[in-house]
């Protein structure tokens, strides 16, 4: 298995990154020292909101982490309602309007309440892979079949 890293995120004077080797790091941006590390297997870009870090593992678990301590606040299995769970992989996610919008390799878009971790909706967008969702001018978009699609 080759190494896959998440995008690097700079926030709160820290650098955050993770990989598919069970390593999620918070690094002090000034000194380069590791503030904390967690065993999370993810190659998706984390999202930081104030002192909370949201990330989704390659196995489909949503993690919420306390930025200052590195302690895991909550873990939610976002694939628990999918029968073909082992074949599905998270593609990317965004946090907007107190919800996590997670795109999956089976063409589904999962909506999760970020406060409770409860899955609110699953929308089948396509029968194949879709991109990570994007927000522009208060509208959500993703790429499917090599075309840009607006999600209502």
Describe the function of each predicted region.
Residues 14-17, 53-55, 63, 99-102, ...:
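Conserved beta-propeller blade signature
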Residues 28-31, 66-70, 113-117, 152:
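Short loop/turn segments that connect beta-strands within beta-propeller blades
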Residues 1-12, 30-50, 74-95, 120-137:
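Extracytoplasmic beta-rich repeat domains
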Residues 21, 59, 106, 145-146:
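Surface-exposed loop/turn positions within WD40 beta-propeller blades
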Residues 42, 58-67:
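Redox- and metal-dependent alpha/beta enzyme cores, enriched for Fe-S-associated oxidoreductases
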Residues 92-111:
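C-terminal hydrophobic structural anchor segments
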Residues 25-26, 63, 110-111, 149-150:
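WD40 beta-propeller blade core
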